[in-house]
Curated annotation (Swiss-Prot):
Signal peptide: none annotated. The RuvA-RuvB-RuvC complex processes Holliday junction (HJ) DNA during genetic recombination and DNA repair, while the RuvA-RuvB complex plays an important role in the rescue of blocked DNA replication forks via replication fork reversal (RFR). RuvA specifically binds to HJ cruciform DNA, conferring on it an open structure. The RuvB hexamer acts as an ATP-dependent pump, pulling dsDNA into and through the RuvAB complex. RuvB forms 2 homohexamers on either side of HJ DNA bound by 1 or 2 RuvA tetramers; 4 subunits per hexamer contact DNA at a time. Belongs to the RuvB family. Residues 262-359 are annotated as: Head domain (RuvB-H). This is Holliday junction branch migration complex subunit RuvB. One of its GO terms (biological process) is DNA repair. Residues 4-188 are annotated as: Large ATPase domain (RuvB-L). One of its GO terms (molecular function) is ATP binding. The gene is ruvB. Residues 189-259 are annotated as: Small ATPAse domain (RuvB-S). Transmembrane segments: none annotated.
Length: 359
């Protein structure tokens, strides 16, 4: 997950966790049976959990990676609940010293689950401490300084590390290789999100029609966290206006007032697309150039804004930079310039080149 960015605080469709999302805990599934979507990952986890319980051993370490808001933290909590063991949570940026990690690890009970969010932001020196802990359930610590320093090995209770990251490529290879169960979470389908929205409406205690749920799901960018946030905002509008049940037109009106369009894009997304279309003739343009022009951090563009735009074909990520896709031109209601319209073979060539745009 990218570092805190104040520009994201007012984005209703931001996939990063906001203060308002504290209410989402009440909407979270409590078991794998309740969990909607991520079918392959969910079914595999169920098998690994059952096998670990049958053997009476700690489950192998799990790496959950994918865009923010897809349920990594929720799945980690479900794993501990299904295993019937304790759950400890922390995050990469919080662990500043090897001693911090040692204190957490030595306090774990046998087979407990330790969840580390944003594990790609762990300092290299702390990663080194984690290697023997994951592989041999032992800690190697240096006690003292100078000539009096000595190495001490501490045995740990067997535990399961469940780690989450939005940037799996930033993990050091030795760390990544120590996860026996790597699972990639993908964007949710509209039908899966419709089920999530309908269930959320029941838990929040308001009447939402199937068409209303479908409208919210369609604009949720394939992300349950955004679906829950839009659901709560639609509920607010409906409550103040005294509308019940909430149908498609009510949901549409509320989302239009939030400036969330039919694809789930907000003003920030449209600024991004408009910048490429108008100022760069559809691209290619480097991400650093876009970040400077939009006054956003590069990480914010790559982790929060771009994944869904790429998924929907609105932009293309090539070795020379970002290009506006045909769907992007259509969504903006603009006609692509002749160079873009006639340059499709070149765009495909760019896409198949090795490497990615650094700028």
């Amino acid at each position: 997950m990218p570092e805190h960015d104040p520009h994201q605080e007012n984005r209703t469709v931001s996939s990063v966790r906001l203060e308002d999302d504290a209410a989402e805990a009440s909407l979270r599934p409590q078991s794998l049976a309740e969990f909607i979507g991520q079918r392959a990952s969910r079914e595999n986890l169920s098998i690994f959990i059952q096998a670990a319980k049958a053997r009476g051993e700690a489950m192998d370490h799990v790496l959950l990676h994918g865009p923010p808001g897809l349920g990594k933290t929720t799945l980690a909590q479900i794993v501990s609940r299904e295993l019937g063991v304790g759950f400890r949570a922390t995050s990469g940026p919080v662990i500043q010293r090897a001693g911090d990690l040692a204190a957490i690890l030595t306090n774990l009970q046998p087979r407990d689950v330790l969840f580390i969010d944003e594990i790609h932001r762990l300092q290299p020196a702390i990663e080194e401490v984690l290697y023997p802990a994951m592989e041999d359930f032992q800690l190697d610590l240096i006690i003292g300084e100078g000539p009096a320093a000595r190495s001490v090995r501490i045995d740990l209770a067997p535990f399961t590390l469940v780690a989450a990251t939005t940037r799996a490529g930033l993990l050091a290879t030795p760390l990544r290789d120590r996860f026996g169960i790597p699972l990639r979470l993908i964007f949710y389908t509209a039908s899966e999100l419709e089920l999530i929205v309908s269930r959320g409406a029941e838990k929040l205690g308001f009447d939402l029609s199937r068409e209303g749920a479908a409208e919210i799901a369609r604009r949720s960018r394939g992300t349950p966290r955004i679906a829950g946030r839009l659901l709560r905002r639609v509920r607010d509008f409906a409550m103040v206006q005294g509308v019940s049940p909430v149908d498609r037109s009510t949901a549409d009106a509320a989302l239009q007032r939030l400036e969330v369009d039919s694809l789930g894009l907000d003003a920030m997304d449209r600024r991004y697309l408009h910048r490429i279309a108008v100022h760069h003739a559809g691209g290619p343009v480097g991400v650093e150039t876009l970040a400077a022009a939009l006054a956003e951090a590069r990480d914010t563009l790559e982790d929060v804004i771009e994944p869904y735009l790429i998924q929907e074909g609105l932009i293309l990520r090539t070795s020379r930079g970002r290009m506006l896709g045909e769907a992007g031109w259509r969504h903006l209601g603009l006609v692509p310039p002749p160079s873009a319209a006639g340059g499709q073979p070149d765009m495909l060539t760019l896409l198949h080149r090795d490497g990615s745009a650094d700028e």
